[in-house]
Amino acid sequence: MTAPPIPRLRTFALLLPLLAAFLLALPAPLRAGLRAGTDVTDITPLPGHFPVSTAGSMRSSSLPGTEERIHCRTLVLGDEGTLLSFTLVDSCLIPRGLLDEAKRKASELTGIPAGHLNVAATHTHSAPAAAPAFQSNPTLDYQIFLAERIANSIAAAHAKLEPCEIGWAVGEDATQVFNRRWHVSEPYKNPFGSMDDQVRMNPGYNKGNGAVTRPAGPVDPAVPLLAVRSAAEGKRPLAVLANYALHYVGNPPRTPEGAAQLSGDYFDRFSRIFAEMAAPGREDFVAILSNGASGDINNIDFSGPAPERSYAPGEKMELVARSVAKAAHEAYGRVEYRAELPVATVARDLDLGVRKPSQEEVDRALEILTSPQQFLDGNYTAAEAIYARETLQIREYPDTVPVRLQAARIGDLCVLTTPCETFVEIGLELKEASPFGTTFLIELANGYNGYLPTPQQHAWGGYETWRAKSSYLETEASTKIVAAFREMMAELEAAP
């Protein structure tokens, strides 16, 4: 006689203890929370790239070699639904074509959509030219090399993704930021022959002659930072992405023989100093400093007399970096971390007009350039000749250009990126308008479209408004960009 069949429910009940024991023996699955990875990649030109043209001056200069190293630093972060990245490059300016190619390669390597990748120049003035600027021109072999290194850095950071916790805080350092545009009472001629400019960049120290009256804009002393640590036991610190609205410092290190060196300016030194403060002995910790809305900001106070002493090469960079790192480290101690946060990002191209020269301005430029000129090492030396050359080049620009805007949300933190040297008051306006608790802007990201003054600053004139490859967008560009960012932030706020 055969035994009666066991009911299915009873069979399941008998197997349940075995199933439970099997599941307990399996490794715990990774939670669907936040993940992050980091990378630091050397972007110093290879021996075959030298001599290189360096950026940051109206005249081209050639560097035969260097003992200093320059880098790009990457942070990839997000959740299972959305990954995004921030890469800061020791470079003055990087054109969109180069960055689009780097992003395309990085997207192929990682699967992260190119529109989720943010790549920005720090704006050091001591790096190889990556974009044409005044009389400096990049070499194609270094541009190709740089695009590959940026893509590889993003891929390397992506390969190191691990569960993490993220938080943010805001410090302050008001000691290193001064508006470099000043109202002046004495008229001066600009390179286009006009005497109408009311504002002058870097006017010199006020020695009581009354020429310098008041700054033409505010400053932003904030030092916001995004902090990342491992979710594993021990909470190993992984990275910091900080932001400061200060153009650059300059006067890079030199060899004992006096030869100029490449340099990542105070941004590179911040990375080293902050890492020593926050994660001593940990070579895998990556500190990144991005440039905020600093198009009209430097660290020179023209309201009083000149300093009693000058700084040795590299000394001022170190002092500024240490000051900013101290402020960032104070904020770092107040970070509250979270293992799960909403992550979202949006991007758009905004078509903006180009300030093309009139025929009269073109004729004047041609007249200047066909008259006898002084040259130094193949460079025009007179400002009017330099800007005449720029006038003829801008004449060939299209009537409109696409300007890339990107915005990312990580919880109640919003990061905006713009391809312009953005005036500080624009950054402050966006912070005030943001629906998020903390917002900061990274400039010179995802391309290069010159200075971004407000319409009022355009009316006042001064270097940052003079038409050139460094300043060519329509006078209402800032108004349109702010409006676009408002819409993008509203879209991010509504994202699930």
PLM regions with names:
Residues 1-12:
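N-terminal secretory signal peptides that target proteins for export/translocation
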Residues 324:
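Anionic-ligand-binding alpha/beta catalytic cores of soluble enzymes and soluble regulatory domains
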